[in-house]
Amino acid sequence: YLYFLMREIKKHNFSKVFDLQNSSRTNFYKNILFPKAGKEIWSSSATTLPAGKNKSEFDKNSVLERFEYQLKDSGLSTLNTLRPDFNWAATDISEIKNFYKITKYILLFPFCSPHLTIKKWPYYNKLIDLISSKYGEEYKVITAPGPTEISEAKNINALALLDNGRALDISQLTALIKDSSFVVANDTGPAHIAAHVGAKGLTLFGKHTTA
């Protein structure tokens, strides 16, 4: 996997990389791709550290504050960095809502990438039972599986929303999250969307969290 990834990246001859993950993994990539590169080629929290600060000190700032500093240091506009708003991506999903007859709903994202199963919380069906026993028909419990998650969604006791048998696209998904009453998600993309459209919710970080 790593060999093919590195070969693919090298093929494009990128002149600059903005590393916003700032993890040990992406630092490993840097050491393979651009071992001697400074911030002119590889922009990361490590290469753009403010004078007199070490990385552990710098990492005490919020993620968005670190992003702002890193991007500003590379000469990019950061007007919206501290106030990310993804609402612009939402599209009209009234037809889908009408088809499934949903108005008030709690949205679950029990899925994760196949290679990151450690992020998966295994108690969603128990949670659905608790929600149903407390709220009855007041809220529908739904999920929105991605293209590779449609089959897996059958194991979750929630209504799986699709668009004519296909997974919702990013704009439809954003609208669904935005209009939800509450979101419960693993640490995946939809959780980040929820945070940036102002949705109420909870992110679960693996199976160590009990129901």
Regions found by a protein language model. Give the residues of each.
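Catalytic machinery of carbohydrate-active enzymes
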Residues: 1-211
